[in-house]
């Protein structure tokens, strides 16, 4: 049904189609992770801000979001990793070589007629470099965010 939907909407072999597919698959994980964290934020903080004269948007923007940065960073990183490493949807929704994603392109180095293991290994290392940089940049949020929302009370 997913392939038929993408074909009907004209989203096969397009970047927009992959963005749509990755967003739809990442959304449940993001909602589940962030809900667990938002449940741990005390309601008293929101109520105190409302008493001090903040609007609902100000409460969200100035109190909830800053407190939620670790959870948002972890959720964003997990979603990015899922899309970065995803193979099956990219292979299914892209039938031309022009729109291959990194994992599908890497898989093309190994076939029954040729095995370019050296090239495959080198490109795998190069593909890991952006992930390593992201983990270094978000390290302080990751340490706090991985356990955030796991224990309530």
How should these model regions be labeled?
Residues 1-153:
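A structural signal for multi-pass alpha-helical bundles of membrane permease subunits
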């Amino acid at each position: 049904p997913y392939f038929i939907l993408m074909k009907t909407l004209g989203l096969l072999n397009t970047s927009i189609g992959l963005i749509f597919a990755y967003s739809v698959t990442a959304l449940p994980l993001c909602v589940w992770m962030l809900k667990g964290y938002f449940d741990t934020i005390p309601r008293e903080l929101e109520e105190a801000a409302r008493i001090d004269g903040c609007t609902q948007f100000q409460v969200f923007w100035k109190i909830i979001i800053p407190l939620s940065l670790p959870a948002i960073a972890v959720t964003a990183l997990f979603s990015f990793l899922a899309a970065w490493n995803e193979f099956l949807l990219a292979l299914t929704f892209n039938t031309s070589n022009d729109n291959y994603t990194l994992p599908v392109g890497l898989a093309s180095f190994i076939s029954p007629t040729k095995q370019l293991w050296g090239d495959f290994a080198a490109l795998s290392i190069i593909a890991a470099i952006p992930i390593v940089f992201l983990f270094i940049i978000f390290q302080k949020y990751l340490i706090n965010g991985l356990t955030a929302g796991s224990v309530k009370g």
